[in-house]
């Protein structure tokens, strides 16, 4: 009998939940990330955070700053800094496009989520975003509450 082929399902590893609330997302791009083996193991265990992280373009390379990856507890060879800069892997054309987009005033590169693709490689979804003002945030909260109330009313009838 032939064996059933098992499909690997990879779930989303980390998500920057505040990003969609604090920023207006204009464009997104998926990038690879350069990590060491022990860092990948920590991310698979969910011991990483994208809060307060951002990306910069320096000398034609994209770098991710302030991404917290807790050191893997069974790693005895090297101890890495949890918030070190990590290189993002993009094509030159994509980097040039991002550079032209963020050259506008008030735009930034913000990571939205990190996930494992079907091949098991860690990918990062970056967004070109513009910061929201306080009144925009209040409007978002109002809209969310109105949607919730509508759903409750629909459920009753």
From Swiss-Prot:
Subcellular location: Cytoplasm
One MF term in the entry's GO annotations: RNA binding
Keywords: Cytoplasm, RNA-binding
Keyword Signal: no
Species of provenance: Chlorobium phaeovibrioides (strain DSM 265 / 1930)
Protein name, as recorded: SsrA-binding protein
Family to which this protein belongs: Belongs to the SmpB family.
UniProt GO cellular component terms: cytosol
Biological process per Gene Ontology, one example term: trans-translation
Pfam family, one: SmpB
InterPro entries per UniProt: SmpB (IPR023620), SsrA-bd_prot (IPR000037), SsrA-bd_prot_CS (IPR020081)
Gene3D superfamilies, per database record: 2.40.280.10
Chain's role: Required for rescue of stalled ribosomes mediated by trans-translation. Binds to transfer-messenger RNA (tmRNA), required for stable association of tmRNA with ribosomes. tmRNA and SmpB together mimic tRNA shape, replacing the anticodon stem-loop with SmpB. tmRNA is encoded by the ssrA gene; the 2 termini fold to resemble tRNA(Ala) and it encodes a 'tag peptide', a short internal open reading frame. During trans-translation Ala-aminoacylated tmRNA acts like a tRNA, entering the A-site of stalled ribosomes, displacing the stalled mRNA.
NCBIfam families reported in the protein's UniProt record: PRK05422.1, smpB
HAMAP family: SmpB
């Amino acid at each position: 009998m032939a064996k059933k082929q098992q499909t690997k399902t990879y779930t989303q590893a980390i998500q920057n939940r505040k990003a969609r609330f604090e920023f207006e997302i204009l464009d997104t791009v998926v990038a690879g990330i350069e990590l060491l083996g022990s860092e990948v193991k920590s991310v698979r265990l969910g011991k990483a955070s994208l809060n307060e992280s951002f990306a910069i373009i320096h000398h034609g390379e994209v770098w991710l700053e302030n991404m917290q990856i807790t050191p893997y507890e069974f790693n005895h060879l090297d101890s890495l800094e949890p918030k070190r800069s990590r290189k993002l892997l993009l094509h030159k054309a994509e980097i040039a496009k991002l550079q032209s987009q963020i050259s506008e005033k008030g735009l930034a590169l913000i990571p939205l989520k990190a996930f494992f693709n079907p091949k098991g490689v860690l990918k990062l979804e970056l967004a070109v975003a513009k910061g929201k003002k306080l009144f925009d945030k209040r409007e978002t909260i109002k809209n969310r509450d109105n949607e919730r109330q509508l759903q409750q009313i629909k459920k009753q009838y």
